[in-house]
């Protein structure tokens, strides 16, 4: 039995890597229905190596493919334009799944929910997934060509 009826998770999900997959797996482990906030192209313009971020439609396609391959059911993907997204509009959300790195974002979401009279979400935190180099696996490092989506160091181009 799932702990929560409705949980939320959000991100850019650019070049789906082990960290993204762990986050999504945890959300489906604890939630019956998972609301996934997927950042718009507009929202990612300030990220490192923004020019290399895949377009929204491609990220959406890759995300759906991952969900289907893993046979995850009961999800809604919603485009978001800011860190709060739809979390103040869906009253019945119960929990938010974040990484250690994005925990502060969950606090911002809860503050916004409280400001509009909604119950704060229970925060579920997963550990950061490390690369073989010892640093966290991140889309920024993948876009920079330093690691692959599995955390393996990229071989220098000769």
Swiss-Prot record:
One of its GO terms (cellular component) is cytoplasm. The keyword Nucleotidyltransferase applies. The gene is coaD. It is found in: Cytoplasm. GO terms for biological process: coenzyme A biosynthetic process. NCBIfam families: CoaD_Thcocales (NF041124), cyt_tran_rel (TIGR00125), PRK00777.1 (NF001985). This is Phosphopantetheine adenylyltransferase. InterPro entries: CoaD_Thcocales, Cyt_trans-like, PPAT_arch, Rossmann-like_a/b/a_fold. It catalyses: (R)-4'-phosphopantetheine + ATP + H(+) = 3'-dephospho-CoA + diphosphate. Its EC number is 2.7.7.3. Keywords: ATP-binding, Coenzyme A biosynthesis, Cytoplasm, Nucleotide-binding, Nucleotidyltransferase, Transferase. Pathway: Cofactor biosynthesis; coenzyme A biosynthesis. Belongs to the eukaryotic CoaD family. Reversibly transfers an adenylyl group from ATP to 4'-phosphopantetheine, yielding dephospho-CoA (dPCoA) and pyrophosphate. One of its GO terms (molecular function) is ATP binding.
